[in-house]
C-alpha cells in the first residue's frame, strides 16, 4: 500500500466518504488540513457549517479518493446532520486528550453517528493532541477500553506533529476497501455459480489487521 497527494488526471477506482466528528476545538480542521494537504496552522478558526477536502491514495494497486468531511462541533450547526452523514463509509470520532469533557461527549457523538450513518460504517476513535502529553486529562486506557467495548478502531494522534495521523486514516480506508472488495468478490462468485460455463479461479482477498465488520456493503463508485 502506498499513499500520496494524488494526480488530478489519474483514474479513480473508488471514492470513500469519511466524516470527522467531535466537539468544537478538538482539532478536526487541523486533522483534515494535515491529511489532505500536509499543512498545519495554529490560527485555524472554528468551522462554520460543513467543508470537505480530498486526497487520492493507492491501496492494493487501486486508486482511492478519500473525501474527508469536516463539520462544526457547535450545537447550532447540528441541523446539517442527516446530509453530513449520508453516504459516509468511514468516521473519525475525535476528542482532545487534554480536555476530559471532549472524551465524555464521545458516546453522544457515537450515538448520533450510528443513528444517521450506515450500520457498517468503519469508525476510528481518535485521541488528538498527543504533542500536549504533559496536559493529558484522558488516560489512554480509558479510550482503549471504550473503543474495545464499542467495536471501534483506536489511535492517539497529533495533527501538529503529524503523529499517527496517516496510520489512522489508512487503517480506516483500508478496512473500507477490504469490505467493498469482499462484497464484490461475493457478487462475482454468485454470478459465476448461476452460470457454470463462466466458473473460473477466484482471487481470495485477505483482510488487513483490525476489526472484522459483519455485513459488507459496497458504497462508492469509481
UniProtKB/Swiss-Prot annotation:
Amino-acid biosynthesis among keywords: no
Species of the source:
Nicotiana tabacum
Where would I look for the motif Effector region in this sequence?
A: 44-52
Q: Which UniProt keywords apply?
A: Cell membrane, GTP-binding, Lipoprotein, Membrane, Nucleotide-binding, Prenylation
Lipid modification S-geranylgeranyl cysteine sits where?
219-220
- Name of the gene this protein is made from: RAB11C
A Pfam family assignment: Ras
Q: Which family does it belong to?
A: Belongs to the small GTPase superfamily. Rab family.
Name of protein = Ras-related protein Rab11C
- PROSITE patterns recorded: RAB
Q: Which domain of life is it from?
A: Eukaryota
Its annotated compartments are: Cell membrane
- Membrane topology qualifier: Lipid-anchor
* InterPro entries, A to Z: P-loop_NTPase, Rab_GTPases_membrane_traffic, Small_GTP-bd, Small_GTPase
Q: Name one GO molecular function term.
A: GTP binding
Amino acid at each position: 500500500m502506498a499513499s500520496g497527494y494524488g494526480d488530478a488526471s489519474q483514474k479513480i477506482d473508488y471514492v470513500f466518504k469519511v466524516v470527522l466528528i467531535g466537539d468544537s476545538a478538538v482539532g478536526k480542521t487541523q486533522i483534515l488540513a494535515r491529511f489532505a494537504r500536509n499543512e498545519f496552522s495554529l490560527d485555524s478558526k472554528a468551522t462554520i457549517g460543513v467543508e470537505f477536502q480530498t486526497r487520492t491514495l493507492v491501496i492494493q494497486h487501486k486508486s482511492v479518493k478519500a473525501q474527508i468531511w469536516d463539520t462544526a462541533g457547535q450545537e447550532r450547526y447540528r441541523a446539517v446532520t442527516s446530509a453530513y452523514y449520508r453516504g459516509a463509509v468511514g468516521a473519525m470520532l475525535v476528542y482532545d486528550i487534554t480536555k476530559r469533557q471532549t472524551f465524555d461527549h464521545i458516546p453522544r457523538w457515537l450515538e448520533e453517528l450510528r443513528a444517521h450513518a450506515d450500520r457498517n460504517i468503519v469508525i476510528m476513535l481518535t485521541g488528538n493532541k498527543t504533542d500536549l502529553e504533559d496536559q493529558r486529562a484522558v488516560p489512554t486506557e480509558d479510550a482503549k477500553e471504550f473503543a474495545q467495548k464499542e467495536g471501534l478502531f483506536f489511535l492517539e494522534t497529533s495533527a501538529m506533529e503529524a503523529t499517527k495521523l496517516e496510520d489512522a486514516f489508512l487503517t480506516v480506508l483500508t478496512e473500507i476497501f477490504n469490505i467493498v472488495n469482499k462484497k464484490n468478490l461475493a457478487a462475482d462468485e454468485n454470478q459465476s455459480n448461476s452460470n457454470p460455463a463462466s466458473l473460473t479461479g477466484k482471487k481470495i482477498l485477505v483482510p488487513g489487521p483490525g476489526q472484522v465488520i459483519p455485513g459488507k456493503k459496497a458504497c462508492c463508485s469509481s
